[in-house]
């Protein structure tokens, strides 16, 4: 457990929690650690879950698949980030997504529903984790709304521009790395990979952006100036 202390201390779920309080809460939440090889499924659609997953090492993809196998990537989680919070907090909820190991991954599972009950001791760290959990759920809801905005665009180019604009605005820079491969980005935006690659090439030829693998530079009349929100 000690080897993962740096990750636990930076995890949003445990923000503002001291070392002693963290040890108490991990015990209270029945923390357990498991490892999964690349490509394996940690959770499958149709299952019920009672635990939140907190990634300690590696990364996971949250995906939806229809009965024909068409994939839609909803999000990606890395060290310090959580998954399955909503389903773990809602009694009887059935997963409509699967969680895949994008790489070899180590995950801590927590019985998060225990923290939703009233603590007899009125512990401040108990309340703090509830607030942190609500913050995480709100942040993920905002990200999901962003994704819906991207997918609502009519063309592949419009979806790409919506996605890149949101990333630039979030980071307040025109140059950044994205967390997806080409296939993953296509699955995230709901387009064909071949069409996405062609459109990226056209946008580069037209001087709208430049890229190398997952590194992108957006080119606008403002690119050589400070990002608008940073002025």
Q: For each of these PLM feature ranges, what is it?
A:
Residues 73-131:
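Cyclic-nucleotide recognition modules
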Residues 1-38, 87-90:
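Cyclic nucleotide-binding regulatory module and flanking cytosolic helices
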Residues 28-29, 47-49:
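Short, small/polar residue-rich loop motifs at catalytic or cofactor-binding pockets
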Residues 154-159, 163-231:
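Phosphate-/nucleic-acid-contacting segments
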Residues 127-130, 134-144:
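Long, hydrophobic or amphipathic alpha-helical segments
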Residues 96-97, 117-124, 143-152, 170-173:
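Short helix-to-loop capping/linker segments positioned immediately adjacent to catalytic or ligand/cofactor-binding
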Residues 39, 50-63, 78-80:
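Glycine- and acidic-residue-biased ligand/ion/polar-headgroup-sensing regions
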Residues 41-47:
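Short phosphate-coordinating micro-motif centered on Lys-Gly-acidic
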